[in-house]
Amino acid sequence: MNQFFRRVLSGLALLVAVVGTTGCQHESQAEQETVRTVSYRAVLESNKPVPEKVDTWIAAMSQEDKVGQLMMISLHGSTIGQSQKDVIRKYRVSGVMLTNENLINKNQVKTFTSDIMQTAITSSMVTPYIAVHRDRILHGNESFLRLPKPNRWGQLPMDRIINLATRSAIEMRDMGFNLVIGPNANLGVPNMSYTSDPTWAGHINLAMVERYQINHMWFAYNYFPAVTLGDASFGSANEAKAYLSNNDVAVFKRLIAQTTANSYMLVMSHIQIPAIDNEHLASSSKPIIDGWLRKELGYKGIVMTDRIDVGALQSNQKIGDYAVASILAGSDLILVDADTIHIDEVHRALTQAVADGTISTERLNESIKRILLMKMQTQMDP
C-alpha cells in the first residue's frame, strides 16, 4: 500500500512538473510572439510622441540592429542586385551613401534608391538614410542639375543661391534621397569652401538647409571643427579654440543655434589639433567631440565621421579599431566606403566592442536614440 501511494505521489509530482513546464513554455512563447509582433512600422505609425516611439523601439531592438544603426556605408555598382541586398540585410545598416559610381542617370538613380528602401522595409529594418554628398558629384554628370563649384557659391547673390538650392533639393528628393551630406561650413578651403567670411558662410548654409527642410530632407553640416589650420599653431587648447571660434567654429555655433534639432547631423573632419588632443584626430577625439562640441557648444544631435578608412589610415590604426575609438569619443555614425572587407571589419569590431562592454549598453543607446530621434520625425517618413 505504501508503495502504491508513493507511486501515486510520484506521478502527481511529475504531472505538476510537466504542467508547470508547459505553462512556462507557453508563457515564453507568448513573450516571444509579443516581441515578434512589435514592428518598426507599427511603432513609427503609432500616435505616440516621437520620444516615446524612440524608447519603445530601442527596447525592442536586437544588439545586431543597434550595431547596424552605427554604420553608413557605400555600395559598388549602378544597380541593387542580390549582393548589394545581402550587404544591407546582413549588416542592417543605418544608411547608404551613393557616390559617383552609383549615379548614371535619373531613372537609374530612382530605381537604385527605391530598391534600397524596399530592401530595408522588407527586412523589417529602420528607415535607412539614403544619402548623397551633393558638392562631390562630378560636374560632367548629366543626371543632376548643374550647380556652381563650391568656391563659386559665395560669389552669387542670395536670390540665386535660394533658387538653385530649391531646385537641387526638389531634384534630390524626387530621386529618392532623404539625406544631403552638406552644406559645407568651412572657411577658405580651396575648391571646398563657399567663402572665407563666417557671416556670409552662415547665411548661405541656412538658406540652403531651409530649402532642404521644406522638401523633407535631412542634411549634414561638414566638417567640424575645420579641415585645415593653415600655418596657425597654438600653445594651449584655449588658444586653439579661441582661434577656431573666430573662424570655422563661428559658423558651426550659429548653425547649431539656428537649425531645428533632429533635422541634421554634423560631420567630423580628420584634422588633428595637438593643442587640444595630441593623440587623436578630431574624428576620434573625446576632448573635441564630447568635450568641445557637445559640452561646451551644446550640440545634442548626431555626429558622423568622414570616411573611416581615411581616418584609420592617417592614424595608422586598423579600421575596426578606429571605428570603435570614434564611437567611444562621442561619434554616433561611422561612414564606411564600399569595400565589403572594410564594412565587415567595422561591423565585427563594433559588435565585439558592444559584446565585451568596451562600448557600454548606455553608450550604445545614446547613439541609437539620437539616430532614431531624427529618423522617427513623422514628416520624414518614407
List PLM regions with ranges.
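C-terminal motif of bacterial Sec signal peptides marking the signal peptidase cleavage site
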Residues: 19-23
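Bacterial N-terminal signal peptides that target proteins for export
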Residues: 2-10
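N-terminal hydrophobic targeting/anchoring segments and the immediately downstream early-domain regions
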Residues: 27-130, 134-139
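Phosphate/pyrophosphate-binding betaalpha-module
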Residues: 207-208, 212-223, 244-263
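Mid-to-C-terminal alpha-helical segments outside catalytic/metal-binding sites
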Residues: 352, 356-382
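Short, well-ordered coil/turn segments that N-cap beta-strands
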Residues: 69, 94, 124-128, 176-178, ...
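Enzymes and membrane/adaptor proteins characterized by extended Gly/Ser/Thr/Asp/Glu-rich
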Residues: 87-204, 223-240, 269-284, 301, ...
